[in-house]
Amino acid sequence: EVTITGTPLDHLLCHCVLPYSNWEWATRCQSESFLSLVGGLQASLGKLGKKPRYLSTDHSSAATHEISPGGGPRAFNPDYLDLCEHYDLWPVTINVACPHEHGDVESQNGHLKRRLKQHLLLRGSRDFASERDYDQFLARVMAAANGPRQARLAEELSAMQPPPPTPLAEYRELAARVSGHSTIRIKNITYSVPSRLIGQRLRVEVYESVLKLYLGRERVLEVPRACGDRGAVINFRHVVGPLLRKPGAF
């Protein structure tokens, strides 16, 4: 368990691997969402400076969906196909319930977990000063692992093309009206906002780990995005004003 100044950091890793050289890159994410996949892929392509011809994945819901109920064949999601089209990647996947078809990648997943555990033991602590410090630790571990793989990586890179100059946006854009309770609802989660925004219509950029709220072109708030599909993120400073104006609220 990794902690940030003593607080557990719940997270996953988006792990990308080139099977021939075993070059790998991993980025921290909160879930197996499509935005996590986009962020992890773009971070990996950014490190490589090139793009492969094929993008192979398992049957994560970020990439595929059931064609019909019952666990049969699955099809690629439209968003995933748009991602592949943007980078001119040919999407491929494994058969349902056949993880051995990604044996090399699955093996690298296990090696990565053991490598991180060893580096944390050598570090002497699983606690980090900030999420950025932990991300830098991950990057150092990845760079060290990739050191001996450079010869084969050079062969792979020689067969690749540069990625497009413009990455995909790593957020979804939504609109939300601020309620009389000084809250908005995004993806089934309730978030409080400053009471001065009551009644306003906000543009919300939904990133994998944060929400950015705009009134017109002005960014008025940035809040951490909650995990899960229900709950509330309430800052009492946002709602205490309206409550104080209500007789008997306290």
Label each residue range with its predicted role.
Residues 9-11, 26-54, 73, 226-232:
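Active-site beta-loop-alpha junctions of metal-dependent nucleic acid enzymes
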Residues 1-3:
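Two-metal-ion RNase H-like nuclease active-site motif
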Residues 211-250:
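Protein C-terminal end segments and domain termini
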Residues 50-72:
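Acidic/histidine-rich, metal-coordinating catalytic segments
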Residues 72-91:
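Two-metal-ion acidic nuclease core segments, chiefly of the RNase H-like superfamily
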Residues 109-208, 218:
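Active-site-proximal acidic segments at structured loop/helix or strand boundaries
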